[in-house]
């Protein structure tokens, strides 16, 4: 069973909490913070924390949320073995797994409503890497 890690900064706290509540009954999921919306925090701290956990085991995946999803994506992608994808549609959430073997999805609370974000997360979690011609490309990342 895959382990899911989830984290956010203050700007992504509400969406992170919503996603966590929706997933906790069905998945082994760990919330790595932040735990307060009212206190401003630095998103790289949470992206690095989650990336370290996800990179420990191939089956681990992560969900990162900030205001736009961009900062979390950039910070997470600095880590070896992390392929973080900023997702804003169901199609690109699926393709991030299918073609790019993404192991972290990043979302922007200010840009993505809860319903679409949840659909993206479900697509991400329920899509496997296709391999084949994409394997060589992913190895080149």
Model regions and ranges:
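Short active-site oxyanion
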Residues: 3-4, 59-62, 81-83
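C-terminal binding/interaction regions
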Residues: 5-7, 11-12, 90-141
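Glycine-rich phosphate/diphosphate-binding loop of Rossmann-like nucleotide-binding domains
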Residues: 6-24
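Short helix-loop-beta junction
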Residues: 21-29, 81
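A short beta-strand-loop structural module common to alpha/beta enzyme folds
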Residues: 28-40
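Short, structured active-site "lid" loops
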Residues: 46-64, 68
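Mid-chain, well-packed structural core segment of small domains
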Residues: 64-106, 110
């Amino acid at each position: 069973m895959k382990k899911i890690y989830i984290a956010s900064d203050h700007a992504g706290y509400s969406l992170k909490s919503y996603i966590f509540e929706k997933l906790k009954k069905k998945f082994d999921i760990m919330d790595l913070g932040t735990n307060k919306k009212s206190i401003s925090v630095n998103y790289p701290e949470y992206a690095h924390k989650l990336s370290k956990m996800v990179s420990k085991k191939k089956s681990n995946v992560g969900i990162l949320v900030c205001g736009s999803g961009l900062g979390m994506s950039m910070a997470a992608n600095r880590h070896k073995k992390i392929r973080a994808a900023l997702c804003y549609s169901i199609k690109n959430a699926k393709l991030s797994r299918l073609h790019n073997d993404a192991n972290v999805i990043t979302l922007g609370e200010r840009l993505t409503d809860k319903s679409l974000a949840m659909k993206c997360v479900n697509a991400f979690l329920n899509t496997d890497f296709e391999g084949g011609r994409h394997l060589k490309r992913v190895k080149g990342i």
